[in-house]
Amino acid sequence: MTDKEKRLERQSRIRNFSIIAHIDHGKSTLADRILEKTSAITQREMKEQLLDSMDLERERGITIKLNSVQLKYKAKDGEEYIFHLIDTPGHVDFTYEVSRSLAACEGAILVVDAAQGIEAQTLANVYLALDNDLEILPVINKIDLPSAEPERVRQEVEDVIGLDASDAVLASAKAGIGIEDILEQIVEKVPAPAGDPEAPLKALIFDSLYDAYRGVVAYIRVVEGTVKPGQKIKMMATGKEFEVIEVGVFTPKAQPADELTVGDVGYLTAAIKNVGDTRVGDTITSAVKPAAEALPGYRKLNPMVYCGLYPIDTAKYNDLREALEKLELNDSSLQYEAETSQALGFGFRCGFLGMLHMEIIQERIEREFKIDLITTAPSVIYDVYMTDGEKIIVDNPSNMPDPQKIERVEEPYVKATMMVPNDYVGAVMELCQGKRGNFIDMQYLDANRVSIVYEMPLAEIVYEFFDQLKSSTKGYASFDYELIGYKPSKLVKMDIMLNGEKIDALSFIVHRDYAYERGKVIVEKLKELIPRQHFEVPIQAAIGQKIVARSTIKAMRKNVLAKCYGGDISRKRKLLEKQKEGKRRMKQVGSVEVPQEAFMAVLKMDDSPKK
């Protein structure tokens, strides 16, 4: 057999697939069982959620970064097949990670919980898989639960998604039921990769990570051609060239190989120093004989949510910078730049894909780098059109220009899809209306579940919307959103003043109709949280020059009349006047300490105005 025939023969036995599911439907457990069944790992190495390697992932039980692994499986027809399993995150913030990993596959196993049925993110991920023309194999998981209703769920898969679920595998990943049927279905139904091993190299980067010794390690799926050590390669998006040092596959552990050819999923190292050079979704080609065009699907990720991160101990500013640099190496979607605040000192303005992404980065900084952080209120990006025709992009409320010069402000809107049990439709619609949502569509999925679609401003979803949605449906709702563009809104910037001074870190942008209520609530909250001083402190909420709400923290005062028993009124008055004069002088020079809870109070605006 020639080299080409060998490669083509091997190619016909490759199956690339990923597992997609809603959070908690048992995706990582199924991956564990498949690894066990194909004996990729010994019993000794087996631990729960084997592919979730980050501590945080194991702790929260979610998948954040994607992982891939090569498995060998001897099928019933006697052939040995090579499987590449690519594990994907299920959370809405990491949709791009899902779409990239799906682009590296030919098939997807759709895991649906036999008790819960289809959820919003199941749908979102299925649509991504269909966009990538993948063969979808439905698997109904957790059939050993007492509340499982596999037949109802099978019907739901057919009705809601439109997939033929007549031969869906009934399985329980935890108990190890049905795993072999799943593997046999992969062999039969998932197509082998197409592509010419002799053509110019085309490989998709679907992830990258930074290794202190080898530089950047790119995770790739070879679509055409062959790549081997010593070859010169070129990145098509950035145009940078490198020489390949090592290629290999994961059998969860990295294992060097002689070459990677069509259909292989593995890793590649070349002396790449900067993660920015291996953009996820980019195409690698040969520098000598480059491919004519790149693979589709690459796009630069733009952050959706911004917030300020400040070290509580200002001496740790440089440590925070190093922490962000290291995290950025592994996370191409994190963006940051230095900023200063009069109230909080030096820190960074960081951009994230969404709220979960933001929480995870904060937690990793506090945990892995031991830096205590203060975070400011998250905000989205506003487009501000000025009266002189200029357009300004504002990601920090304190940069909002003077209201007199603004013609209009546009904010990002999202299309939010919620899957809700029937009984809670009213509560959810009320919540969405209160968040300035516009009703778009409502469909009954079956007798007791409804899908509701709203258009809403991203700014309203950013903070605590998901928590409120969960609490108004007793935890049963699921939720997914996609950006649909910018729309004009009546937005104003509200400043909070303490003792007549603006506190920049407490400024926020709010819709004009809600400004008065929002201002009133915050002023009252701050009054409770800021400790009393020796002089009285007015707290004011202002829009431009206009004060919309005010509250006063009363001064602590000593009883100066204690030693005047009875006594003449003029004597008492003299002592009181003297005390008053002292307080007045103090008020001119005194400054107010704002505790961290006060910043958090502005964020936790859960009592949003009811319409």
UniProtKB/Swiss-Prot annotation:
Keywords: Cell membrane, GTP-binding, Hydrolase, Membrane, Nucleotide-binding, Protein biosynthesis
Subcellular location: Cell membrane
Superkingdom classification of source: Bacteria
Topology class, membrane: Peripheral membrane protein
Gene Ontology CC: one annotated term: plasma membrane
Matching InterPro entries: EF-4, EFG_III/V, EFG_V-like, EFTu-like_2, G_TR_CS, LepA_C_sf, LepA_CTD, LepA_IV
SMART domains: EFG_C
Binding of GTP, residues: 24-29, 141-144
PROSITE patterns, per database record: G_TR_1 (PS00301), G_TR_2 (PS51722)
Family annotation (CDD domains): EF4_II (cd03699), EF4_III (cd16260), LepA (cd01890), lepA_C (cd03709)
Molecular function GO labels: GTP binding; GTPase activity; ribosome binding; translation elongation factor activity
Documented EC number(s): 3.6.5.n1
Domain tr-type G: 12-194
Top EC class of this enzyme: hydrolase
Pfam families to which the protein is assigned, alphabetical: EFG_C, GTP_EFTU, GTP_EFTU_D2, LepA_C
The UniProt record lists the keyword Acetylation: no
Biological processes, Gene Ontology terms: positive regulation of translation
Catalytic reaction annotation: GTP + H2O = GDP + phosphate + H(+)
Family statement drawn from the similarity comment of this UniProt entry: Belongs to the TRAFAC class translation factor GTPase superfamily. Classic translation factor GTPase family. LepA subfamily.
Task of the protein: Required for accurate and efficient protein synthesis under certain stress conditions. May act as a fidelity factor of the translation reaction, by catalyzing a one-codon backward translocation of tRNAs on improperly translocated ribosomes. Back-translocation proceeds from a post-translocation (POST) complex to a pre-translocation (PRE) complex, thus giving elongation factor G a second chance to translocate the tRNAs correctly. Binds to ribosomes in a GTP-dependent manner.
Name of protein: Elongation factor 4
Organism ancestry: Bacteria, Bacillati, Bacillota, Bacilli, Bacillales
